[in-house]
Each structure stands twice: as C-alpha cells, then as structure tokens.
Amino acid sequence: MQADFVIIGSGSAGSALAYRLSEDGKNSVLVIEAGGSDFGPFIQMPAALAWPMSMKRYNWGYLSEPEPNLNNRRITAPRGKVIGGSSSINGMVYVRGHAEDFNRWEELGASGWAYADVLPYFKRMEHSHGGEEGWRGTDGPLHVQRGGFTNPLFRAFIEAGKQAGFETTDDYNGSKQEGFGLMEQTIFSGRRWSAANAYLKPALKRKNVGMVYGLARKIVIEDGRATGVEIERGGKVEVVKATREVIVSASSFNSPKLLMLSGIGPGQHLNDMGIAVKADRPGVGANLQDHMEFYFQQVSTKPVSLYSWLPWFWQGVAGAQWLLSKGGLGASNQFEACAFLRSAPGLKQPDIQYHFLPVAISYDGKAAAKSHGFQVHVGYNLSKSRGSVTLRSPDPKAEPVLRFNYMSHPEDWEKFRHCVRLTREIFGQTAFDAYRGPEIQPGEGVQSDEQIDAFLREHLESAYHPCGTCKMGAKDDPMAVVDPQTRVIGVDGLRVADSSIFPHVTYGNLNGPSIMTGEKAADHILGKQPLARSNQEPWINPRAAVSDR
C-alpha cells in the first residue's frame, strides 16, 4: 500500500487533514487508525457521553503515573481509539480559545499562528448555528449549536453570574469570550458531530482517500527522510509507503510515543530504550500540559434537575426516544450554560472555566446524593505545571509513561482555592435562593486553605485536555519539535499536526483548536498561501486592570 500522504490517526486534526488534503482530487491520502467504527448509540447519542470514555473498545485507557501532589493517585487520561479519535468520546463542548492564547503561541515561536492568523481557519471549519455574525463561519463541515436551554437551573446560573457583577456574553466563540452565557456543542440533528462525522466520512467517499485499521508501530526513516509507516494488523507487520509525506496526528500521548519509537526524541532516553537515534530532539514528550477540574455540587430543593432521569428505566426511556426521533434529553450533552472568568485584576483574558450541569453526579455517572441537585465543573485553565511523556519500553504496544506533575506550581493551589470560594459566591446569589440546598461537595465544613487543599488533593481530576508534547516553535529553539509549518525539525517528509504541537495550552476545551490545527496544517502541507489574516479585534474587558469582573 502507498499514498501521497499517510496520516497516522483519524482524530480531530487527522480527520480535518484527510478532508483538506484530498479536496482537489489530485493527491492520494491514506489514514491509519488503531481503533474501529463509531457506529452505535454509545458514541452518537450526545447524552450517552459518559459511556464511550469508559469502554476499552473506544478508549486507549491510559492512566498517569502516581501524582505526588494528588495523594499519589493515578489520574485517568482517556484518548479516543476509534474513528474521530477523542472527538468521538469527548463532552462535545466547543471552545475556540481566547485570542491571547494564539498571540502567546506566536510569542513562543509559532510564527504565523497568532489570533489574526488562525481566526480565518476557525471560520472556514465552522457551520455555526446562531453565533455572532461576522465572527463565525456558516458553511464549514463542523456544525456548532446551542442546547435547548429549557431547564430553569441554567437560567439561574447565568443570572447568578450577573448578580455577582460578572459580564455576560452572547457568543463566547465570537468577539467576547469573557462572561456567563450559553455553551456551544458539536451536535447536529441530535447526533454527536465528531470530526469523523464532519470530515472523515465525507472524505472517505472520495476515490483518492482510503483507510487502514491497524496499529502504527513506527515511522520508517531512510537517509533522513520519512518514507512510510510500519503498521501491524491481523497479527502481521507491513509497511505503508508515503510518496510525499507522513503526518502524525495520533494525540498528545501517542504522537510523541511514535516519534520516539522511530528514533526521534531525547537522545539519552532513546539510547536507554535501545532505539537508534535518528534525530536528537529533547522536546519530544516534554512540555506536557493539561487542564484540571473538580465538581462543585449543591442539593436542589426543587425537583427540577435531571435526577429523575438517572434510574436505568428512565435512561432507557430517554434512549428509546432518541433512537426513534433523535430528540429529547438524549439529543443534548446537557452542558448548556457556562462561564469564562478572570481570577484577578490585571489579567487580559479569562483563566477560570465553568461547565454548569443541572444534576449532581459523580465521575462514574451515579447520583452524588439521594436528591435533586446541580453542579459546576470548575477549573483553572492556565496552569504553569508541566509534565512529560516517555517510553515504558521499545514495544509499540506498551503504554507510554505519563507524568503530568499536576499542581507542582504554587500558583495552581492559589487559583484553585479561589475557584472554590468564587463558586460559593456565585451559588450564594439570590438567583439560586429558590433552588439552593446543602452543599454536597466540597462540603460546608471545607473552609480554610488547608481544608480546601486536602479536598483538592483527593478530588481534582483531569479535564482531558492534554497538549504540548511535540511543541511548535522556531527552528533554533532546542525544545521545539516542529517548525511553524508543522515540519519535524531534523527529518524531511514528516510532520506532526494535533494538540501535541500547541506551544501553550489554550483556554478552553481542545477539540476546536485541534481541528483548526489540522485545517491550517493542510494548507502548509499543500504549499498554499495561508488564508488572509483577520483585522478583527476581540473584546478585552475595559476594567481588566482594576477588577476581576
């Protein structure tokens, strides 16, 4: 088998690459995917979002090493092992990120990836339903919508934010991210609108696009050039040849793993693994970043939450309704209200994110209390903690070693304590008076810094937004892995395009910027002129210097 372009991974970026690289019909494209089909309600029904992430069929099922700052807990680190990758098992929340995120990328050496450069690509990929005119795309492959917003708890949350003095926003993916508002979802016609549904399946209808299901073992490098990919399928090892380029889009865990298995990475580590060094790039696997979050949960004194739908019988009713009509509760991920807030004066961009949910549930999907309730997933999104991905062994089937070093920076503790206290302030507004019962978690007895820290050590979890392990930067940056054209430094014919190349984590969920990365990388690969830079200026809070709201 051979193709002009061989893409490893059919996730958010890989699917977009397959679509754009094959668009004019001139190039043959072959996608390698270790997982399988996304057919069935567990993936396609939005309300079933907790299921695919817990199923080995769809998830690589990685765990971190014991995290010393989190009571040595091993933190769940899911990645999609299915067409569409993690866009097929995620929460379907769509966030572009803040303009300052991408300006920071350029400052860190990713020339041509400032907000003015990437905004046109966000517009190209979007089919926005109800977004801010002039700031959103309307005819792209990726449908983005808002939920029905029928539960009164959503309205209470947004009204509470206003009462606390915070901004509201009509479209956080438009000119103004900061504030309380309606959350956007990658859902269309009642179905999860993954990268597979948006990009990959339409691309596979073209004669010049193919897919092979198999495990990528390593990239074949001959005389300093990537010429193919060694894969294993059906117990047999074979090589897929690339006549032009190999593009790695295998996730922030598996992309650096593949590079290292292929001899690209920190020289000493590769020597320790018995792998011949093809390119000594110490940045491969370094710079691992992620978002953390905890659940803040409250009893609802009125029976208006989704608690009544948690018993198996009523889940079955919702599932049957969805199967018949693609409607009802099953057609929403139930994340329909949110907030993007600044933790302190002097910040130009938000750094705290809220996902509001009209039910109080545990990470396993069970009720957090025997009563109606509501909760927010709250996290500090600009952590300074950094981790790494390394090889466990030279065996391609071995899981990588994930060391996040969560909460290793003192500022993280200060910010998360603020998150706890700020959430109490928001839930304490009069908008919640009709609904507010006892605090379930952290609990009303958790007040001091020491008590909050103890709660955080036991309850912080990943928000599943890993990035940065194949950092994009200037060629003279010793820690950069790819240049701003996504080319692997030191190896010809090889690129990386996924969230692993982010120089710095963006503020918000990563599916959107990962797809954008695939879109923009495709133009670089094809040698096209980049889309014209935008001259639109995003809203920055005029009170930012003196107030947090």
UniProtKB/Swiss-Prot annotation:
GO molecular function, a single term: betaine-aldehyde dehydrogenase (NAD+) activity
Record: active site: 465 (proton acceptor)
Sorted UniProt keywords: FAD, Flavoprotein, NAD, Oxidoreductase
Binding positions for FAD per the UniProt entry: 4-33
Cofactor(s) recorded in Swiss-Prot or TrEMBL: FAD
Pfam families reported in the protein's UniProt record: GMC_oxred_C, GMC_oxred_N
EC number: 1.1.99.1, 1.2.1.8
Catalysed reaction equations from the record: choline + A = betaine aldehyde + AH2; betaine aldehyde + NAD(+) + H2O = glycine betaine + NADH + 2 H(+)
Keyword Flavoprotein: yes
Record pathway: Amine and polyamine biosynthesis; betaine biosynthesis via choline pathway; betaine aldehyde from choline (cytochrome c reductase route): step 1/1
SUPFAM superfamilies, sorted: FAD-linked reductases, C-terminal domain, FAD/NAD(P)-binding domain
Presence of the UniProt keyword Flavoprotein in the record: yes
Gene Ontology terms: biological process: glycine betaine biosynthetic process from choline
One GO location term (cellular component): membrane
Function: Involved in the biosynthesis of the osmoprotectant glycine betaine. Catalyzes the oxidation of choline to betaine aldehyde and betaine aldehyde to glycine betaine at the same rate.
Family note: Belongs to the GMC oxidoreductase family.
Protein name (database record): Oxygen-dependent choline dehydrogenase
Organism in which the protein naturally occurs: Rhizobium etli (strain CIAT 652)
